[in-house]
Swiss-Prot record:
The gene is Ctf1. Induces cardiac myocyte hypertrophy in vitro. Binds to and activates the ILST/gp130 receptor. This is Cardiotrophin-1. It is found in: Secreted. The lineage of its organism: Eukaryota, Metazoa, Chordata, Craniata, Vertebrata. It comes from Rattus norvegicus (Rat). GO terms for cellular component: extracellular region; extracellular space.
Amino acid sequence: MSQREGSLEDHQTDSSFSFLPHLEAKIRQTHNLARLLTKYADQLLEEYVQQQGEPFGLPGFSPPRLPLAGLSGPAPSHAGLPVSERLRQDAAALSALPALLDAVRRRQAELNPRAPRLLRSLEDAARQVRALGAAVETVLAALGAAARGPVPEPVATSALFTSNSAAGVFSAKVLGLHVCGLYGEWVSRTEGDLGQLVPGGVA
């Protein structure tokens, strides 16, 4: 671990540690954005399910978890990592989400053209998560723990999102559900990780 990273981790155990005022303000601002997007993500997931028809939303329905190239949910070990590494992983996931959300929106425009609210929500989610990712990267850079290079955008989902067969449509709906779920998981995780840097925040 570098000396800079060590200083960042010391914040978790040393209550006297404080950031420069402008950095503290940026952390609070980014944390507030993550908290707001966590709320929006719950609404997006609910709205998405409502628009997919049966069996989505039925009690006991458990859709298969289809793989997504370049993105998965936070690993169980995530919480045990140093906060700087957690934020790096958050930033990487957030950078991958806009392209996936855009792909879901395009497919939903074909499947549910009369659901403008859902389409707008997906468009807003892609824009907002892009802004959150940029803000997290700014915080990391200011802390001397910048993200380790760009993450390639996932491209292997295109065939599943565009197939018009019955199986392809169902898979596209399931993938969209998965993307909306991952969006919620990562913005919530980002909120929690940033909360450890906010003065008075809880671990």
